[in-house]
From Swiss-Prot:
Keywords noted in UniProt: Amino-acid transport, Antiport, Cell inner membrane, Cell membrane, Membrane, Transmembrane, Transmembrane helix, Transport
Subcellular location per the Swiss-Prot or TrEMBL entry: Cell inner membrane
The protein, known as: Leucine efflux protein
GO BP: L-leucine transport
Pfam families: LysE
Length: 212
């Protein structure tokens, strides 16, 4: 399938993409958290931020920016530390709000929804490993002798985004159902928020220690 467009072993790629999307990461965790705290609208706004951020990174990977980042340690480190700092900021903010007893059932006005989208977008864009991954993974399924490898890259990128959309939709719908349950279980909600905050801090530490 899509061999005429320079895509190799598409079905193998699809299976690989599914497994990759299922691996827990800060993006999926952020979407799940917002679907629980802000409902389906908050979850899908977070997902939109992730989709757009990923699309930008995929385009940069195709444009050759990934090679520049990989061969320029200082550039890689700048993006890496920015990403780690932002993850630490999000984790600390969640932990602080939980410890102070702030209730996530607070008003869900438009500025809050806008902030969710922006945070998700920044979270996605400040992951230098993602852009390097897209190159190393996609190149295995692209015929370098094809006349238009950009089309091949687009097909693979679109497939990954569609798989991600399906999985994040599942998380968002599940999170919305969980919201109805934890509204009457405040202690459980606090424990859940604390764990999410700690996981973001853990992701920050892992990103800060990654090498290009």
């Amino acid at each position: 399938m899509f061999a005429e467009y320079g895509v190799l072993n598409y079905w193998t790629y699809l299976v690989g993409a599914i497994f990759i999307v299922l691996v827990p990461g800060p993006n999926t965790l952020f979407v799940l958290k917002n679907s629980v705290s802000s409902g389906m609208k908050g979850g899908y706004l977070a997902a939109c931020g992730v989709f757009i951020g990923d699309a930008v990174l995929m385009f940069l990977a195709w444009a050759g920016v990934a090679t520049l980042i990989k061969t320029t340690p200082i550039l890689f480190n700048i993006v890496r530390y920015l990403g780690a700092f932002y993850l630490l900021y999000l984790g600390s903010k969640i932990l602080y709000a939980t410890l102070k007893g702030k209730n996530n059932e607070a008003k869900s006005d438009e500025p809050q929804y806008g902030a969710i989208f922006k945070r998700a977008l920044i979270l996605s864009l400040t992951n230098p490993k993602a852009i390097l991954f897209y190159v190393s993974f996609f190149v295995q399924f692209i015929d370098v002798n094809a006349p238009h490898t950009g089309i091949s890259f687009f097909i693979l990128a679109t497939t990954l985004e569609l798989v991600s959309f399906c999985y994040l939709s599942f998380l968002i719908i599940s999170g919305a159902f969980v919201t109805q349950y934890i509204r009457t279980k405040k202690k459980l909600a606090k424990v859940g928020n604390s764990l999410i905050g700690l996981m973001f801090v853990g992701f920050a530490a892992r990103l800060a220690t990654l090498q290009s």
